[in-house]
């Protein structure tokens, strides 16, 4: 048995009908668009309140199970629903796509047809057609003479065919709503693309070191980490007279293939950007100290953060003075200004030492260090904390916001139309606008007045009908 093959158009025809008559009207429903918008706004608020892209330990500490925040919000619920990365969850992206589809459907079914209607026009050829306009009048013994020029002076585009005239201005206002929809679609597309292809990372790099981007805190499914490296040429901090940190700086180089391709000094609010990746100055730390004991070669000792009750920053390092590590010094550093506080293994304060200076321990603490022992503090090595971010959707978002402002401004232009018909007895004049009715009423009244004063009268052959100028019934007499 052979099954006859059907043409492709026979298969596609039901799909087209379903798309045009069922799916498209559903997506274009204003209630659906408002509901999606409110859902996106609510989830965005949740993503603003709940810290994003933090560690599990952070959520366990801030959202414990007992007692639960608001009686139900725990770290398990946050991680299960993906509220720790709201903007990258599949359901949030699905809402954005659905909202974008609703906007596109609205543009296709409502805004685009309205623009097509606005671009089409026709002359009014019968006097009674003017009576259906919001503003109209009859000027007996008047003609079209001078009217086209006056309309052009007011910014109208004028079309004339003998005794018939049509003029319009503000057509750009009809493009405004469409441009607003297009801009919103670009913003949504940029947000979706940024969630899928963007990433966030952190790096704590000591001064003088080179590091790659490895500590990723969040990345989309389509994200690609760059292969170039970051070199910290120098890191330093500016302090206020009272000891507060004013600003911290990092002299960075981008190494691509071992070659320096960009160098820039960054600080807070002054990042470095390279190939769509932005490096922000976010934090700082002390990585290590370089010291010498007596005449030994310089050696480097790492430092570790020391917790304090006040929550202030403090770092410590242990410097052994014996090969078996039974004796030594504890150095505490509160900042990068180069001052270290020295304590022995019993916790007794010995003295202080500044970067680039030496301290004879056998002189300041002869009981603890009877033999000659001089400590040289050559350098306190700082580390810069970088926040690294790549969001390829940002150009689309910026373009969308620019077009949005332009579209909103365009929407404020009134779309005004004027018709005129010259007969043997006189002139019929009418018009309408979609906004600024009072302004158009005044403009139309001035236009009628100027036409009455400038147009030469001719013998009337029929009585004037009732006319409406500015929305009021009157009898237009020359």
From Swiss-Prot:
Name of this chain's protein: Cytochrome c biogenesis protein CcsB
Protein's membrane topology: Multi-pass membrane protein
Alphabetical list of InterPro entries matching this protein: Cyt_c_bgen_Ccs1/CcsB/ResB (IPR023494), ResB-like_domain (IPR007816)
GO cellular component annotations of the record: plasma membrane-derived thylakoid membrane
Compositional bias segments (type: Pro residues): 456-466
Presence of keyword Thylakoid: yes
Location of the protein in the cell: Cellular thylakoid membrane
Family to which this protein belongs: Belongs to the Ccs1/CcsB family.
Assembly, per entry: May interact with CcsA.
Coarse class of the protein's main subcellular location: membrane
GO biological process, one term: cytochrome complex assembly
Keywords: Cytochrome c-type biogenesis, Membrane, Thylakoid, Transmembrane, Transmembrane helix
Residue spans crossing the bilayer: 30-50, 89-109, 175-195
Organism: Synechococcus sp. (strain JA-3-3Ab)
Region of interest: Disordered: 453-478
Function: Required during biogenesis of c-type cytochromes (cytochrome c6 and cytochrome f) at the step of heme attachment.
């Amino acid at each position: 048995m052979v099954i006859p093959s059907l043409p492709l158009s026979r298969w596609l025809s039901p799909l087209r009908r379903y798309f045009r008559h069922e799916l498209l009207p559903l997506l274009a429903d204003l209630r659906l668009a408002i509901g999606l918008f409110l859902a996106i706004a609510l989830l965005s608020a949740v993503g603003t309140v709940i810290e994003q892209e933090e560690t599990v330990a952070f959520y366990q500490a801030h959202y414990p199970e007992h007692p639960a925040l608001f009686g139900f919000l725990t770290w398990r619920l946050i991680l299960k629903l993906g509220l720790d990365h709201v903007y990258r969850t599949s359901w949030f992206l699905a809402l954005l796509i659905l909202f974008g589809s609703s906007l596109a459907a609205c543009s296709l079914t409502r805004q685009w047809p309205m623009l097509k209607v606005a671009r089409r026009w026709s002359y009014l050829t019968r006097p009674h057609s003017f009576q259906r306009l919001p503003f109209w009048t009859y000027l007996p013994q008047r003609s079209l003479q001078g009217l086209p020029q006056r309309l052009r002076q007011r910014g109208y585009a004028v079309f004339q065919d003998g005794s018939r005239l049509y003029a319009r201005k503000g057509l750009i206002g009809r493009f405004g709503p469409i441009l607003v929809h297009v801009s919103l679609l670009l913003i949504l597309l940029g947000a979706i693309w940024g969630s899928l292809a963007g990433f966030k990372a952190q790096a704590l790099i000591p001064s003088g070191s080179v590091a790659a981007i490895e500590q990723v805190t969040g990345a989309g499914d389509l994200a690609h980490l760059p292969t170039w490296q970051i070199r910290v040429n120098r890191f330093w901090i500016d302090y206020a007279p009272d000891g507060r940190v004013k600003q911290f700086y990092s002299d960075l180089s981008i190494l691509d293939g071992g070659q320096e391709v960009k160098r820039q000094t960054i600080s807070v609010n002054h990042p470095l950007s390279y190939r769509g990746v932005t490096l922000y100055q976010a934090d700082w730390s002390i990585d290590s100290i370089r010291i010498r004991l007596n005449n030994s070669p310089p050696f480097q000792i790492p430092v570790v953060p020391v917790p304090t009750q006040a929550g202030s920053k403090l770092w410590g390092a242990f410097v052994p003075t014996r090969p078996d590590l039974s004796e030594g010094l504890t150095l505490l550093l509160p900042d990068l200004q180069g001052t270290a506080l020295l304590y022995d293994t019993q916790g007794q304060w010995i003295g202080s030492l500044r970067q680039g200076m030496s301290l004879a321990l056998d002189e300041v603490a002869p009981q603890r260090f009877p033999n000659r022992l001089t400590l040289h503090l050559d350098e306190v090595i700082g580390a810069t904390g970088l926040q690294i971010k790549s969001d390829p959707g940002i150009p689309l978002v910026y373009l969308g916001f620019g077009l949005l402002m332009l579209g909103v401004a365009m929407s404020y232009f009134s779309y005004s139309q004027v018709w005129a018909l010259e007969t043997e007895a006189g002139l019929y004049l009418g018009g309408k606008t979609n906004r600024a009715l009072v302004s158009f009423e005044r403009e139309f009244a001035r236009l009628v007045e100027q036409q009455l004063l400038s147009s030469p009268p001719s013998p009337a052959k029929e009585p004037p009908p009732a006319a409406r100028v500015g929305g009021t019934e009157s009898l237009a007499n020359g």
